[in-house]
Regions:
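Polytopic transmembrane helical bundles with strong interfacial aromatic enrichment
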Residues: 1-326
């Protein structure tokens, strides 16, 4: 019963994230809309008037044009608030699916790839609400976040779904809660962090005068400096948690397998992720390193996390090969 409910809630959450993405796109489109301003009405002036005052002065918005611009801005704002409301609904459905899954399994819902992806993506969207509460001006990033949510949750539902089964013996430990919880939480923050990192690269290019794709998408994004700052804050917050997760995993491995580190594929890729993210923070703190270089390192770090999640579980054999897929 609870398992079926969880599956249904996941499906509804995907649809809700999709609707939120569309409404965010409407806000984006309205924000890019231009109000046509007609030429000013001709006036009869004296022969000596206009040489100084009229030359070079462009058309000024009429009252009608100003009103139209205000209406468009109001509609864009309403669409943005509506998109946030639908995203909240999607996140509640998402959370309900995780709770129902945990109740049905009588354990934390982190036992396989399907459950892990659902949990990481939920942490990402929940963290987004905290960012939005602190920085409402960043709302338009929601378009790209909801796109990521649709892709991840739909991938979990369509390709990674696994019926509820008991945990494999290797996971029956209190370290399961400690290690996996910190991995899930830090991965969710890294997921959110890659969104402003990519947005920064587009916005920085737009501010430098680039008008080709994809830089034109950044026309209505927040300022590049704000996006870059958010990228740093999220990664600086998540990196110590991820570091603890790696250490906790080594302690658990010592207790379970008799060695703390054996260069198992998942351990190797966790180390690669740690090195890349450490490199990002070092680059970010080095004045001589350009911000776009540091942002590319943040994106590379997330790609290594995705490799560790999908690639290692699907293509490698090791002690961590219990992703739940046949």
């Amino acid at each position: 019963m609870m398992s079926v409910l969880s599956d249904q809630l996941v499906t509804f959450s995907i649809l809700a994230y999709l609707v939120a993405m569309v409404v965010h796109a409407v806000e984006y489109a309205l924000g890019n809309a231009r109000v046509r301003v007609g030429p000013p009405a001709r006036e009869l002036v004296g022969a000596g008037v206009g040489a100084a005052g009229g030359a070079g002065s462009g058309p000024e918005p009429t009252d009608g044009a100003a009103t139209a611009a205000q209406r468009t801005a109001a509609r864009a704002r309403m669409a943005g608030l509506g998109a946030v409301a639908v995203t909240v609904l999607a996140a509640l459905l998402h959370l309900g699916a995780l709770i129902a899954r945990g109740v049905a399994a009588d354990r934390m819902p982190w036992g396989n790839m399907y459950e892990f992806v659902l949990t990481v993506s939920f942490i990402g969207v929940a963290s987004w609400f905290v960012v939005l509460w602190k920085r409402p001006t960043l709302r338009r990033l929601g378009l790209f976040l909801t796109l990521v949510m649709v892709l991840l949750v739909a991938t979990a539902e369509l390709l990674l779904y696994t019926p509820i089964v008991p945990l494999v013996p290797a996971l029956n430990s209190y370290w399961f809660i400690i290690h996996v919880a910190t991995v899930v939480f830090s991965s969710g923050i890294f997921l959110l962090g890659v969104v402003p990192a990519g947005a920064f690269l587009m916005r920085a290019g737009y501010e430098q005068g680039r008008r080709s794709f994809p830089y034109l998408l950044a026309k209505r994004m927040p300022a590049a400096a704000a996006l870059e700052r958010l990228t740093f804050v999220l990664h600086a917050f998540s990196f110590p948690i991820f570091t603890f997760a790696v250490i906790a995993g080594a302690i658990w491995a010592e207790a379970a397998w008799g060695r703390a580190w054996g260069w198992d594929p998942k351990e190797t890729w966790a180390f690669i992720s740690w090195v890349v993210y450490a490199g990002y923070l070092h680059a970010r703190a080095t004045p001589s390193v350009k911000r776009n270089v540091a942002s590319w390192l943040a994106i590379l770090g997330f790609l290594t996390v995705m490799m560790n999640l999908f690639g290692v579980n699907l293509f490698f054999e090791g002690l961590h090969s219990y992703g739940g897929l046949d």
